UniProtKB/Swiss-Prot annotation:
Matches recorded under InterPro entries: BRCT_dom (IPR001357), BRCT_dom_sf (IPR036420), DisA/LigA_HHH (IPR041663), DNA_ligase (IPR001679), DNA_ligase_AS (IPR018239), DNA_ligase_CS (IPR033136), DNAligase_adenylation (IPR013839), DNAligase_N (IPR013840)
Organism from which the protein derives: Rhodopirellula baltica (strain DSM 10527 / NCIMB 13988 / SH1)
Function noted in UniProt: DNA ligase that catalyzes the formation of phosphodiester linkages between 5'-phosphoryl and 3'-hydroxyl groups in double-stranded DNA using NAD as a coenzyme and as the energy source for the reaction. It is essential for DNA replication and repair of damaged DNA.
Designated name of the protein: DNA ligase
Swiss-Prot/TrEMBL GO biological process terms: DNA repair; DNA replication
Ligase recorded as keyword: yes
Amino acid sequence: MPQDRFVASDSIASRVQQLVDEINRHNRLYYDDAAPEITDLQYDQLLAELTQLENDHPDLRRPDSPTQLVGGDVVDQLVQVPHRVPMLSIDNTYSREELAAAMERIEKSLEGESVAWTMEYKIDGVAGSIRYENGELTLALTRGNGQVGDDITHNVRTIRELPRSIADAALAHPEVAGGNVPEVLEVRGELYMTDADLADLNVRQTDAGHEPFKNTRNVTAGTIRLLDPKIAASRNIRFFCHGSGELVGVRASDHMTFLQHVQALGIPIAPDVVRFENKEDALQAIAKLELEMPDLPFEIDGIVFKVDSFEQREKLGVRSKSPRWVIAYKFERYEAITTLEAIDVQVGKTGTITPVAYLTPVDIADTTVSRASLHNADEIERLDVRVGDTVVVEKAGKIIPKVVRVEKHARTKPLPKFEFPTHCPQCDEVLTRDEGGVYIRCTNPACPAQLRQRLVYFGSRTGMDIDGLGEEVVDLLLQKELVENYADLYRLNVDELAELTWPRLRKGKGDEMIEVQFGRKNAESLVAGINESRTRGLARVLSSISIRHIGPRVAKLITAKFWNLDLLRSAKAEDLAAIHEIGDRIAESLVKFIHSESGSQTLSDLDAVGVTMSETEPVATPDEEANLPLAGKNIVATGTLQHYTRDEIKARIEELGGRAASSVSKKTDFLIAGEKAGSKLTKAESLGVEVLSEDDFRLRYETEAT
């Protein structure tokens, strides 16, 4: 009899393991790949069997069990737990001058060493620390006071993007921990909610008769501290890793390598992290990030700069509340009080009807603000804002000013409510609400206001970056009926443009508007700018032609896998949704556009006029990068090379999976030495770093790569 009990126990343990693995596989198929293999009823039956077995045998309940993911036990209270490594805050600067001075001080502390910097968005969420022990997620904490945080493990387990176990991934990626499972991996990052998820949540709130949430940060902070994980599971809180706490058995000598390792383990990392060899390049890149901010799917309140090298971080050390190797350039929130003079509605490039507040001009953060966003009809209703009201206007993270509240005590007389239009103000099409009920749109593809906005965006710096194609020129081309779509721009010629006339203001006694010829010089400049944009590539095209939810970053992620027009047209929604960070909403929007009559025609027309509808080559995935010849290697090139320029050798090293460094150190795997190699060669030899000639490098690695 005792033997029978042991056999039964082994059999039950085996069945539990089988169910956990099987249900987790179905979760990935359903949530990540959008390709379920079983019905909801079959899934529920498997989950019910596992739940019953775990209730009967609690000792067999595994940390990665799907029963621990959603609908775990309600906790009685949040328990405070000490951080193994203090979770410090970041010092802030509020101007580029302050930022440059802070970075200069940091570099001076390293006494002349070359310093590489990383730059990333400062996501406006809630700081969190997530701990894996021997590959299993065991603990998640808030920052708290930096020394002690609240245990929010029950809620963090509901984040579907976050793996409960990293053991298999660690074994599959030996560069992370030498082929072992890390004893301790503690990732630090930001818990947050996207703008779209907040909009969806607020629809549910309103339908249930509850007040909508004001912003993503507040709802995130409240949600992760709830005692019932079922509520957290319903709100789609997400996580980005941007740093580390305690690490035991993890191989990484710098921040960028650490993030690559974390990503290989399936943990989401902060988006668009960029490494620069010096602070000057990093500071210059701020402008580019600011251009992309309005298209981000989440709120940010600054940009963070970090010393990349862990060795240099150790030298710099920490203060009582913050590390000395990181500094934030923060967008301070500025407010001002003014009067709402009028509300108008604008038609966007995808047909979205956006209400705009016209204000008595007021100075905010050295900028005169006379217009501000009111977002949508629901926001007008929530604020109960009316023409004539005294309002508070805020200018912060994403630059665009917005009305945040009404000073109702200053409303001394009755003011009429704003009536949102039922028809498009430009084409008189009946307006419709999205399925989610948040946005109101004009669905007329021939709406002239949409065409104008689409063409303006197409020519903008974040679009195809066409010099000379601004709002006035777009208005002129539309007025003269020279363009009806994007492809028409590429059919324009200098002669017909030069003969156009447009109204200009003549200064002088009694200013007046006169008709002035566009002229050959303007025409040649515009046509040259249009022609130059032909080779921007497929990612740039996709993000420029006003497809809903497809901005520059999303387009890059998609074209890394579907890198030409044929591949893109053959892609199914589930194929696109399987790409990390894409999801069903974006995938369905793109597929709908590609296979619609107007969308298909747009792509074909651009292809026909010679616009490049592909990327040079597909970008390697993290798995593919790990198999490249120089994966994980730090390489320095010095001296005059015969077959490469400085930029070409750097690009080639990176194409082969390596990291092109600017200075020699103990971390350097090898030095490529050309003629007149100089001091870097001397230093490499003194440190025992391997030295390759240019021919050695070509023979060893160019052959491997072909």
